[in-house]
From Swiss-Prot:
Delivers copper to copper zinc superoxide dismutase (SOD1). Residues 11-74 form the HMA domain. This is Copper chaperone for superoxide dismutase. Homodimer, and heterodimer with SOD1. Interacts with COMMD1. Interacts with XIAP/BIRC4. Interacts with SLC31A1(via C-terminal domain); this interaction is Cu(1+)-mediated. The heterodimer CCS:SOD1 interacts with SLC31A1; this heterotrimer is Cu(1+)-mediated and its maintenance is regulated through SOD1 activation. Disulfide bonds join C141-C227. In the C-terminal section; belongs to the Cu-Zn superoxide dismutase family. Gene3D superfamilies: 3.30.70.100, Superoxide dismutase, copper/zinc binding domain. Binds 2 copper ions per subunit. Binds 1 zinc ion per subunit. Its cofactor is Cu(2+); Zn(2+). GO terms for cellular component: cytoplasm. One of its GO terms (molecular function) is copper ion binding. Zn(2+) binds at H147, H155, H164, D167.
Amino acid sequence: MASDSRDRETACMLEFAVQMTCQSCVDAVSRSLQGVAGIQSVEVQLENQMVLVQTTLPSQVVQALLEDTGRQAVLKGMGSGRWQNLEAAVAILGGSGPVQGVVRFLQLTPERCLIEGTIDGLKPGLHGLHVHQFGDLTRNCNSCGDHFNPDGMSHGGPQDSDRHRGDLGNVCADADGRAVFRMEDELLKVWDVIGRSLVIDEGEDDLGRGGHPLSKITGNSGERLACGIIARSAGLFQNPKQICSCDGLTIWEERXRPIAGEGRKEPAQPPAHL
């Protein structure tokens, strides 16, 4: 089952690369995170241009705080603790429309999985979010298969015992069309979903309670807006890269360019979460 109650959430460790050149940079970064609810500890390493944050906040929120100092920040890894890396994954969502986003998965404990991310381009309101059976994008999101359901259950909400394992409930987009979320789930395991897909839908998931013929199948949440394959990603201290071997871009140059495609050759202004 999933949880989004702040007092029940499990803190994770976020590893950021932050452009810092002097002690005043360190002081500014430290002040930006000082006293922020949901941040439990901060370690700033000038020599490594690294900031470690133990927090229950979404990584996008912490990154925005760091970049409010006028310095670029790149999330390089996540972990459940400094000395433990169970498994981590990421899905980069896109489709034929304007919806795009990044969603990260982290196995906090053998029994508890963190799902957090930012999705842009949505209509304000609730949108169903689900892990689907296949990592097949040959027909955009229509080839992703049904909800991930190895237990043969009916569709339900993340708090229900009778639910698909891929049922993550709803995320809420604000007036600007951005959904920033963090949830924990006791059924989903990162190692079970790598290679599958994550899909965001056009409407609200009724959590199996709507009485519609699709309620117990899909939650009647409408068309699939955007999707991405769930792939392994770096845990803490597992991503030492400073320069991309494929094209020679530094992590700071990558921060201001698309992840792939022709646009990567020229500077571009990306969404803040990429």
